């Protein structure tokens, strides 16, 4: 899911436990206006919502964390080292074996198993670190006590209450991150209502406990953001002697094409037409710049988290998982073969 830089999130998450929570004053005019809005727009009973907000806790430490200057982004070789560990790869293989059927089923949407695994591995270590805050506390705190982004978080609070009603959840029960991201794949409420899928067919979308729902929802999110079955995510490139004038590194848009990059002298091996959208990515390696070319599926991953580093880490972890655990052959309908960075070179 799109959210703040991972390292800034981690630092802020640690800080949120230092200040005590205080009861939210549900009689505040802004809270009462929100309750009236929910009643008018969506038919909620004001008295029932008032009882819910009477039990909500505002957390000043969350506001303090949001106000803290963003942590400097780590260079690629340090960022990658956080996610490409033996422990994370081994846990991913273990998860793949335990959840083979949910993975197989979700992959029928056209997203290979290793990418579904990799996103859950990067987001929450395969469900181990899904957050410890009540979602309603986090969202209400940011909706009513953090003016710079109050509009956004009031919208997410609205979506969360609708989600809770649709899924027959006690709105005081779900837990997640300090910013309100939920479950194993860390969906915000708007994303949950838009892209979460009932993968196991039980009538509910459970991103905390159902791996069928988790993997199907991640696959649906990526497909809805442009993922193309059978196409590569990214390949390594050689930019030695290439004309890189005018290229804006760090941008997420696919502003070039396979053909235009080759015309500049960038060397890479991929079986895509010259007209295929592409972006040249420069990463800070241990021995100097590393160049890669990202394609439409790379861009789809950046819709989950708007960072080239994030999408590159997901791609590398997916490749490592595929090497450590050979995904079983797909049953009908057949998914296209996985294309890794190394196999495309």
Give the label of every model feature segment.
Residues 1-9:
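Bacterial N-terminal signal peptides that target proteins for export
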Residues 16-20:
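N-terminal signal peptide c-region/cleavage motif recognized by signal peptidases
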Residues 24-107:
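An acidic, Gly/Ser/Thr/Pro-rich helix-cap/linker signature
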Residues 30, 41, 237-345:
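C-terminal soluble interaction/assembly domains
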Residues 50-58, 112-127, 160-165, 218-219:
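Short, functionally critical alpha-helical segments immediately adjacent to catalytic or ligand/cofactor-binding
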Residues 58-65, 124-134, 145-150, 166-172, ...:
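Secretory-pathway/luminal and periplasmic proteins that interact with or process carbohydrate-rich
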Residues 81-94, 143-146, 150-151, 193-209, ...:
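Substrate-binding clefts and substrate-entry loops adjacent to catalytic sites
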Residues 171, 175-286:
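Flexible, glycine-rich surface segments
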């Amino acid at each position: 899911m799109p959210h703040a830089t991972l390292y800034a999130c981690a630092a802020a998450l640690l800080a949120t436990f230092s200040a005590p929570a205080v009861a939210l004053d549900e009689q505040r005019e802004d809270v009462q206006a929100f309750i009236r809005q929910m009643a008018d727009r969506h038919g909620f009973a004001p008295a029932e919502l008032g009882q819910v907000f009477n039990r909500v806790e505002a957390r000043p430490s969350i506001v303090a964390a949001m106000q803290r200057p963003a942590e400097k982004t780590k260079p690629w070789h340090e960022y990658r080292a956080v996610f490409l560990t033996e422990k994370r790869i081994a846990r991913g293989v273990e998860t793949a074996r335990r959840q083979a059927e949910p993975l197989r089923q979700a992959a029928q949407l056209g997203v290979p198993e290793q990418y579904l695994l990799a996103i859950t591995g990067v987001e929450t270590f395969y469900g181990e670190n899904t957050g410890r805050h009540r979602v309603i506390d986090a969202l209400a705190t940011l909706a009513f006590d953090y003016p710079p982004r109050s509009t956004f978080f009031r919208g997410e609070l609205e979506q969360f209450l609708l989600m809770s009603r649709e899924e027959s959840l006690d709105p005081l029960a779900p837990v997640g991150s300090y910013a309100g991201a939920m479950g194993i794949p860390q969906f915000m409420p708007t994303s949950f209502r838009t892209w979460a899928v009932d993968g196991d067919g039980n009538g509910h979308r459970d991103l905390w406990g159902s791996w069928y729902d988790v993997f199907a929802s991640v696959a649906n999110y990526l497909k809805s953001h442009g993922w193309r079955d059978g196409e590569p995510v990214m390949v390594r490139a050689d930019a030695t002697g290439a004309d890189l004038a005018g290229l804006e590194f760090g941008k997420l848009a696919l502003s070039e094409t396979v053909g235009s990059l080759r015309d500049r002298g960038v060397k890479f091996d991929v079986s895509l037409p010259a007209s295929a959208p592409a972006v040249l990515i420069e990463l800070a390696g241990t021995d100097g710049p590393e160049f890669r070319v990202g394609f439409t599926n790379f861009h789809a991953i950046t819709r989950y988290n708007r960072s080239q580093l994030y999408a590159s880490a997901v791609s590398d972890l997916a490749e490592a998982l595929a090497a450590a655990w050979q995904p079983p052959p797909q049953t009908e309908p057949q998914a296209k073969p996985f294309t890794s960075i190394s196999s495309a070179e």
